[in-house]
Amino acid sequence: MKRLVIYYIATSNYKMGLAHFKLNIHKFFPQFEKTVVILSDGLDEWNNVEENGVTYKVHHIHHFCWPIITLFKMTLIRDFWEECDYACYFNGNMQCNKDYDYNNSNYDFDKLNCAWHVNSSNVEFDGSNFANISNNSVAFINEPYKYIHGGYFFGPSDIVKEMCNDVSKMVEEDLKKNVIPQWHDESYLNKWCVLNKDKVNKQRFVSYQKYTTDQSIAIIETIEKDRRTTKRFFK
């Protein structure tokens, strides 16, 4: 049986998303042996738990303020890497929105599968738009492209691992210049996909999961608080 490792980063109030995420994840390619690797500042009670045939592992990480947690997303995945046939990532505020079957899906299992951003699925951007803060960033893209959502990706382990390593190097290169692109991991993911078009199958598979009003407000408040904190460190 092929092994799929799903990386799931959830700190602060994003930890609430796990209750929704775990409802359907067993329907996500049921032909695979699935392990969910949770990177969190909590959720320790889920370490070594098995539910609906899915194994959960928890690795404790510091609650870094926004945008650090997203900026180093690929680095975290690289650092907590587990050998597998396929690797996947879900944001803490997302979940699988339907059943997926290996023999009946529009996935390319030899490439990195990404998702169009929900607000830009039919729009082409270039390097001068909001996707990158300036051409000082390694993530700057100077050609038309469709903007990819950073909250999800899936692919064979060798390609996902290559992407995480490459993006980590991009982040390090920018930080040496005190540069952070506007959309952090998303900007670097888009740049990697532009540079590696032959390794990418871009389809729109997932959407943001709508939580209850209380949860949505709590998540938004956390993001805004982290934005204010971050401004003290990054001008």
Name what the model sees in each region.
Residues 70, 74, 93-94, 182-187:
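Conserved glycosyltransferase catalytic-site signature
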Residues 11-13, 42-45, 63-64, 94-96, ...:
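Short, solvent-exposed loop/turn segments at secondary-structure junctions
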Residues 138-228:
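Catalytic core and acceptor-binding pocket of nucleotide-sugar-dependent glycosyltransferases
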Residues 1-72, 79-83, 224-226, 231-232:
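N-terminal anchoring/stem segment of glycosyltransferases
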Residues 73-124:
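GT-A fold catalytic core of metal-dependent nucleotide-sugar glycosyltransferases
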Residues 44-54, 102-108, 211-213:
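Short loop/helix-cap segments at secondary-structure boundaries that form the rim of catalytic
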Residues 69-78, 129-142:
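Short acidic (Asp/Glu) patches
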Residues 34-41, 88, 113-114, 199-200:
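Short, hydrophobic beta-strand segments that form beta-sheet elements in well-ordered domains
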